[in-house]
Amino acid sequence: MEAISSELNYFEAPVIQTAVQEEYDQEISPIATIQDGAPIEFMVKGVRDLYLDLNNTKLEVCLKICETNGTALVAGDRIGVDNLMLHSMFSNVDMEVGQKQVTDPNNLYPYRSIFETILNYPREVLDTRMICEGWTKDTAAQFDVTDPTGANTGLGTREQNYRASRAVRFIGRPHLDLFHQEKLLPGGVDMKLRFIPHKAPFVILNAAATAEVPQKNLKVSISSAKLYIRTKKVSPSLIMAHEQMLQTGTYKIPFTKVQMKTLTIPQGVTNFQYDNLYLGNLPDRIALALVHDEAVTGSYTRNPFKFDHYGLTHLGLKVGGEQIPKIPYQPDFTTRDYLREYMTVLSALGFDMGPNCWDITPTEWANGYNIYVFKITPGPLGIVKSLSRAGNIRLEIKFREATTHNITAILLSEDRDILEIDKNFHGI
């Protein structure tokens, strides 16, 4: 078949869409007055002709750091905070669509957010848009520095925003499955969101207390929160067509389902295996990082986003006896021999070819950004899908020396799922 280039095609009129008649941001306030430490809940009632574009919806929060009794920080106080504050300040976010719970209950929302931010966004995004969400890159190999005046320049930059308990405002898209897909939420479907604040020792970083400078009792105080939902008014003819099709079928919204889980690697081991890490339909991709267990539970003096290698010398997955990756991760951090492992991560992320570059250098990856990625499903993970795999996954880790404390392995998995909505606008 002979093709013709667009600059020579004069006889076809441009396609004009008439389905979306109006587009705007709808401001939603919490259903109750915000109280320190209490969940922040939003209720969005479905309207028949208003479809919701969650992919372009934003959460805005205004907050400050102060003492638990409300006293403002004084000029000499130097209080650091976690990276990506818009998200790390919440332990979990519950989401309900059409009376169906579509999120898993856990306290790992900060880790999902930081994983997705570090792994998915190139430098151009991190240095611009993600600043609005509280992102400032921590200095590699300086994650243990909790004094904001120290060598971690990222921590120092963030600290300046909170001096004297000044109000700080962040805005960005929540890290929720349905907020990262392109289909609109149909009109008439109710949606509930519940943001659960994290405890202060997880969010706030401060130098260790001394006799001269005791540890202050601090809190994150949220003064306002708003949800800006991108709303699209749809033509009556399209609504009628949708409702007619609903009589014999359902709305189907495919999305990438992200699940978080943790494993505890005990003190005093050089080998760690875990059978049945995933069972049944296997995820398309898995990311793993190791964190000090005290940081995960919350500590003023430990950065929860320090992903250490702990002298790891072997890391791999067994899927029905098959090794993934075929050549397992076998870094030697004592001799700085880890470039192949770094490139394996880039390949699993899709940053090994083309113009997009990962923001993490090999040296940074080995010094606090040590995240490993496993691609389970062969082929592309975009619009064109390969068949999912089924079976079970075994995790194998080896360390050069015995672990000196408990380590938490944090895992993020990506799989495919579909949300269906029936004619009563209920999720099924």
Predicted regions span which residues?
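Short, low-complexity Pro/Thr/Gly
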Residues: M1-I428
